[in-house]
Amino acid sequence: MPTLKDIRVRIKGVKSTQQVTKAMKMVAAAKLRKAQERAVMARPYAAKLKEMLGSLSGKVDTSASPLLADRADASRVLVVLITSDRGLCGAFNTNIIKLAHRTIHEEYAAAYAAGNVQLICAGTRGFDFFRKRGYSVLKGYPAVFQNLDFSTAREIAETASSMYVKGEVDRVVVVYNEFKSVLAPTLKAEVLLPIKSELPVAEGGDYIYEPSPAAIIEELVPKHLNTQVWGMMLESNAAEQAARMTAMDSATENAKELLRGLNISYNRARQAAITKELSEIVGGADALQN
């Protein structure tokens, strides 16, 4: 049975942990507001680019941009995995790594068996996981979310598009967390390349393109890819902060329950010690009288 001193030490330790988790929850909440704002602000621009590309895709031949050309046989695959740099965010990284693993070993099992699956990992957790297990990690961006910048998204998009144009890969898939709400992030494995031909055609009046749809699409496609990757990174960052805030809130509540139980145990042990001392005093007094 633990002594009063042991229980006091545990209470002190739990209180210290509770203060840390509470502070981390507040920090995550502040970061979430900022990350959510950035993700929401990026959506309209990405949607408009997608709309324009949808309007153009029906007016040009796929030869206008090799990134529009579909390849039926996905025998060489590039997986872009977006995880977090740090832990203490619940099952955020575990779930997204599981999805990436399942995508590689189920959807692209033949390509993996032939050694034709490569990865680009944005975020320390995913990078460390797949590198240590012997996967072909083409590029890693550890600690990328410490200072999230558009240049990283552009570099990833340019690397992926260059490999696709050169025929080094037949499919580019991005695995990430899409931010829907604090309690409902969505795991996604989205095909980035080839660009899907079923992009939504712009509603309403048609656009007039100068100098030509083919010339514009050549400029528009790289911007679209850059924006898509950037948006995915922003979504993942917001989902990470939401997961961390939720995890730290749960940890704080668990610490509160643990403290309640420890205080009850402490009071019972203290009461038992006092009762024992009183019994010894009474027993000693009786012995003296006799």
From Swiss-Prot:
It is a peripheral membrane protein. Keywords: ATP synthesis, Cell inner membrane, Cell membrane, CF(1), Hydrogen ion transport, Ion transport, Membrane, Transport. Its main location: membrane. It is found in: Cell inner membrane. Pfam families: ATP-synt. InterPro entries: ATP_synth_F1_ATPase_gsu, ATP_synth_F1_gsu, ATP_synth_F1_gsu_CS. The keyword Ion transport applies. GO terms for cellular component: plasma membrane; proton-transporting ATP synthase complex. GO terms for biological process: proton motive force-driven plasma membrane ATP synthesis. The keyword Cell inner membrane applies. GO terms for molecular function: ATP binding; proton-transporting ATP synthase activity, rotational mechanism. It comes from the Bacteria. Belongs to the ATPase gamma chain family. Produces ATP from ADP in the presence of a proton gradient across the membrane. The gamma chain is believed to be important in regulating ATPase activity and the flow of protons through the CF(0) complex. HAMAP family: ATP_synth_gamma_bact. F-type ATPases have 2 components, CF(1) - the catalytic core - and CF(0) - the membrane proton channel. CF(1) has five subunits: alpha(3), beta(3), gamma(1), delta(1), epsilon(1). CF(0) has three main subunits: a, b and c. This is ATP synthase gamma chain. It comes from Chlorobium luteolum (strain DSM 273 / BCRC 81028 / 2530) (Pelodictyon luteolum).
